[in-house]
């Protein structure tokens, strides 16, 4: 059984292109057109983070977690002002496909504790974060709020998993 037990979705606070900082912090990054870019670390690096060589994407929740991020949201201020680089439908769909792939590969069931956004870590897992709100707005889907966005991530991932299993 895999030691990787959850997938956490983020945004990178960038324009629509992946940068080196994102590659150091996430396992998979999705550019504005949906292109997947691998990070510097494989998900397996996060099976045990004691060596310090892993993708550090979520405070006190990196061990056992795979980090996915949309290259987006530079200039975002709050859910009503997502800036000039909001998450696109293409990258959201590609990220959900990537999460579904990793869930299938590692036997991760889709629940609010195993597939979630960074904005849900504190409420769903009880791990204190520092005011993180990624992903709490999805303008392409006209959604605001961590739970609403997390529910869309989970339902999209689940639908993709079901199609994979047909």
PLM-predicted stretches and their roles:
Residues 1-61, 131, 137-139, 151, ...:
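N-terminal catalytic cores of peptidoglycan-degrading enzymes
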Residues 59-72:
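Short coil-to-beta-strand
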Residues 1-4, 71-166:
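Basic/polar, cationic surfaces and motifs that engage anionic cell-wall
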